[in-house]
């Protein structure tokens, strides 16, 4: 049986970071990845010469150490000009600061409602939206989008995840954006960076290639008493220290003799899955937006981005591409891929993005984990799981290992911290 000082489960960006920093400290370490390809959510895939990431990925980290790693890769710098589409109208993001394309009646309704917004201490995300934007704006835009992105109504979500992810509304900005078309950047980053070649994974490829990683190694049992991990291929390894970036519900389900209270807490955690609909076009003139949000309820996708706008290396010469993201709650039945493809195809034509003849292919891929969902009291249930794992000396990292709304740089740091602690 193989024996290692440190065993790491999962070779997404957090697991890669943990492995890389363990090796820098001269630890005898091995990272095991269930899939045949490393990278997790920051991995990519190719279809007929087109490259796609697993959903939209752009780096805007301000952390100097992460920059020192990522910046070893030649990158393209983009302005974070995101847009939204709503009933055929393209509005700059965030919508509340860019109401200019709307008719006068809509503008008056939204602005009056903002001025008269309730003063309250929000108990949930719905009340937070009403407090920030007023009933009219909140109900028309972010509340409807919430159901598409999070899979739950806004009142069922807490507010602990928001941070700087949602732009607070200011009356001057709203009025300026209603009276004239504005080019101001109201996003939470001033620059978005993306590798010139190879897709988003290139930011960490150099690290991954230095790491001891075994692919196609799915952990199916963790015996804490004997410090042993068993894999689906029948092999096993012993460890002195165990680091896991596996989703908490998955990890707890494979721990031998995991207490019922902990299992129940882990099973209660919910998340979104993602269906990716990737399209290659036999033309270049698609909407010139890195990414855009989709408010139309009859369009099943919540968001789309253009790999070919992020880098021309992602598409053959003279071609272009889009990828649509359809989110679903983990507790619900999987969506039908054929119906998703048909829905997106119809909406592409309705939006005027292309003709049917200009579509080279429409490809479907399913991601079983997209984002953790912050329903009420999630943190208390999560803490039950984390306290137990800490008591048996299992360290966790990454978006799903810490069960938090981490961006890729935060997941990178999370993996590093499991070794530095």
Report the location of each language-model feature:
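N-terminal Rossmann-like FAD-binding beta1-loop-alpha1 element of flavoenzymes
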Residues: 4-31
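Mid-domain catalytic core of redox enzymes
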Residues: 25, 218-322, 326-338, 346-352, ...
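Conserved flavin/dinucleotide-binding core of flavoenzymes
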Residues: 44, 309-421
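Dinucleotide-binding Rossmann-like beta1-alpha1 core, especially the glycine-rich loop
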Residues: 48-120
